[in-house]
């Protein structure tokens, strides 16, 4: 992270010494119990997707809390694991919108410029939202603010009430926001299904002269 395109710009948005606080927090939680994702994958979203490459942002809440699921990318799991319910619904909507994708691992999206950002970057095993409100939100809000400052258009995809609260951080008029209910089984039928976020994103990118995302790759 230290040498990434993000580092200094994020640092400007944070209180003094906040990176030190994050490192101290991670030292403590990884030494005291099982935490996901593996420590070397915590910052995967911004390590795989450099700031200059960001075309799309998909905001999640926190990592999956089961063994081997979390990869540091929102909604993504390794291909050898079953898709969790929200990801199943994302892939179902993708199939209806554009076409079928067999991969559960969304790294290829990240490599194309889709920033798969969770608001909270770590979670204790089997404790959803177990690290919420402790350290990460100022950092990930800073990431969103840095993307908001970009001079090239970005699509922000906000699924569910939690992600939609981040809308207040996105005030640059060149960007485009797509909102819908969350893809979880509890809310997918309330407007996520049929929202066509993938084709709508590509339509916006095409109109702006930006290469589209190959969502099926």
Curated annotation (Swiss-Prot):
It is found in: Cytoplasm. This is Uracil-DNA glycosylase. It is an enzyme of class 3 (hydrolase). Belongs to the uracil-DNA glycosylase (UDG) superfamily. UNG family. It comes from the Bacteria. SUPFAM superfamilies: Uracil-DNA glycosylase-like (SSF52141). It comes from Streptococcus agalactiae serotype V (strain ATCC BAA-611 / 2603 V/R). The keyword Hydrolase applies. GO terms for cellular component: cytoplasm. Gene3D superfamilies: Uracil-DNA glycosylase-like domain (3.40.470.10). GO terms for biological process: base-excision repair, AP site formation via deaminated base removal. The active site is at residue 62. Keywords: Cytoplasm, DNA damage, DNA repair, Hydrolase. It catalyses: Hydrolyzes single-stranded DNA or mismatched double-stranded DNA and polynucleotides, releasing free uracil. Its main location: cytoplasm. Transmembrane segments: none annotated. Excises uracil residues from the DNA which can arise as a result of misincorporation of dUMP residues by DNA polymerase or due to deamination of cytosine. SMART domains: UDG, UreE_C. GO terms for molecular function: uracil DNA N-glycosylase activity. It holds the Pfam family UDG. Its EC number is 3.2.2.27.
């Amino acid at each position: 992270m230290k040498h990434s395109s993000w580092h200094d710009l994020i640092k400007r948005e944070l209180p003094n010494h906040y990176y030190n606080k994050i490192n101290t927090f991670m030292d403590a939680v990884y030494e005291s119990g099982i935490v996901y994702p593996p420590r070397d994958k915590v910052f995967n979203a911004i390590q795989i997707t450099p700031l200059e490459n960001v075309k799309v942002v998909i905001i999640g809440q926190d990592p999956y809390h089961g063994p081997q699921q979390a990869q540091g990318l929102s909604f993504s799991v390794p291909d050898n694991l079953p898709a969790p319910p929200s990801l199943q619904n994302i892939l179902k909507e993708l199939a209806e919108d554009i076409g079928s994708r067999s991969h559960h691992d969304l790294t290829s999206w990240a490599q194309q410029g889709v920033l798969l950002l969770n608001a909270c970057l770590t979670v204790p095993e089997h404790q959803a939202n177990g690290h919420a409100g402790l350290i990460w939100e100022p950092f990930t809000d800073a990431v969103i603010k840095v993307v908001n400052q970009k001079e090239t258009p970005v699509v922000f995809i906000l699924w569910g009430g939690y992600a939609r609260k981040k809308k207040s951080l996105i005030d640059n008029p060149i960007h485009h926001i797509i909102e819908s209910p969350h893809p979880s089984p509890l809310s997918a039928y309330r407007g996520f299904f049929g929202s066509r976020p993938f084709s709508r994103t590509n339509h916006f990118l095409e109109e702006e002269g930006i290469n589209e995302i190959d969502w099926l790759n």
